[in-house]
Amino acid sequence: MLKKFLLNSLSAFVGAWVALMLFIFATVLFFIGLAASVASVESVSVSKHSILKLSLSGTIEEKERATEFDYNYLIQGGIEKPQTLNVIVKALQEAAINRNIDALYIECGGVSAAPATLNAIRSQVAEFKKSGKKVYAYGDGMTMGDYFVASVAYSLFVNPYGEVHLAGISGTTLFFKDLLDKVGIEFEVVKVGTYKSAVEPYIMNEMSAPARAQLDTLYTEMWDYILKDMASGRRMKASGINRLVNEFVMLKSGKDLVKYGLVDRSVYKREIDDIMARLVGRDRDKLHYVNPDALVGSTSWGAAYGSKRQIAVLYATGDIAETPSAGINCEKLVPVITSLAEDDKVKGLVLRVNSPGGSVFGSEQIGEALDYFQSKGKKLAVSMGDYAASGGYWISAGADRIFADPLTITGSIGIFGLVPNISGLTGKLGVHPQTVSTNPGVAFPSLFYPMNDAQRAALQANIEQGYDRFISRVAKGRHKSKEYIRSIAEGRVWSAPAAKRIGLVDELGSLSDAIKWVASESGVDDNYDVAVYPSYKPSVWDMVPAALQENAAVQELAARFESHSVDKALARWAAWMVSRPHAQAISLDVDIRL
């Protein structure tokens, strides 16, 4: 009895101590979040002769994360947020009309982003120039993404020993067929679409002719657009820049780059402040730079709860899933769309799509919810980002108008299924599975047996049914015949200009263009607020990655903590922290970045 009493007392003490520590930690997080939220809406005072400083470095995300708190920003790097496209664009728009902003300075530091994201920034910089304010850019060295954006500047500087990595567009795909054969793993494929090449790395040792042809066309069209814009910015001929690229200009130093006309001057970084000081008529030590986050302040798009007329912007970013995920979760997105449809304040919707696709079921649920939104007599436009392909196009197809960046990748109207079979591997390891079933579909699909003809035929029929649904949705949304859509589908990806020519896209334009169109069509013109969704305020439990919230080990630990009177949310969070060292994830992503 005494032993049991002592154990219970110790357990209660440990539980109370854990609860106290977690409460303190959660409180700290709360006040950090509160301070950050206050800072994000506080009006920023910009002194006269200020300079907007745009740092091109690292990755640029579509918008602030709205699905999951990223503890890495807090633990590893303070509360500094990653750069986001929506903030950069809004800051450039604000700087163009702010009388206290005299110029824009672009500091190139190795940006990594898809071409459409960079083009959106470059286009907005070009709009900023129309205000008559100067744009200067500098880099110790420049990636092609840096140079693509910076080439629109009035004056472009590079370090005397810096290089500009102009090399063109390339993509490499790894093929695993021989490796899989060696280890005894086979992937059985069912698909519809000649160009649906995502399965090829698992069943082939080289790229198919259709896959190579579509990528060659896509890359060439994108490179031609980028060349044309860079040449226009530098007042050169596109053919001249292309010739320099082919002559490995990326290995030339700053002085040579000046001679070729790719940059204006080669200077050291310490000289930039002197140049900017002369530009705005200030002493060097009195220069005032303001970053996009600080400038945007209370002017950023957000949920305008006090407004009677709103144009909603709903972000759909990442892979489409039907269960909780870090991408587009239909379980969370569909209720948001339904709520917007039934909200009288919301007069129209812009769906911002940046997705390479995903679940057929998830795509259809989102598509049906958007149909419901339109059934309320409200206008729907789609603004495409880097990608709106496969499932990303599925959810876009029914819009009243589709806008795409000139460097958007879209299309890929096709479906595939990939079924692994590890019977060869288990045989090599001396493992021999035996299955007893009442019906043929109980253990289907199985990792341990290849599909038989009946199973393969049933799965193929399922895939073709999904493909027909895809074709029908696109045909209805684009007001085309199913036969025509089939002729341009087949899983082929298209550049935005090509997609416009064949009727998959209506306009080449920005998110701002899409918002203005919806406002005009909804009859609200300039008298409206823009409200961004999904809005999100993370709880302590939301700080745990969604994939781990369902982990059995985490749940078991959480139950133990809860048994000692620890708050449920805190208990689950603590359990995840305990189990975190054992959690790993592997992802394979293929995309184009400049």
Where are these regions (language model features)?
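Intrinsic disorder and flexible/low-complexity segments
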Residues: 306-311, 315-345, 462, 534-594
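Short glycine/threonine-rich loop-to-helix capping motif typified by GTGT followed
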Residues: 360-365, 498-501, 543-546
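C-terminal long alpha-helix characteristic of the crotonase
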Residues: 232-233, 264-308, 416, 471-477, ...
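Short alpha-helical segments and helix-capping/turn motifs at coil-helix boundaries
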Residues: 35-40, 89-90, 297-298
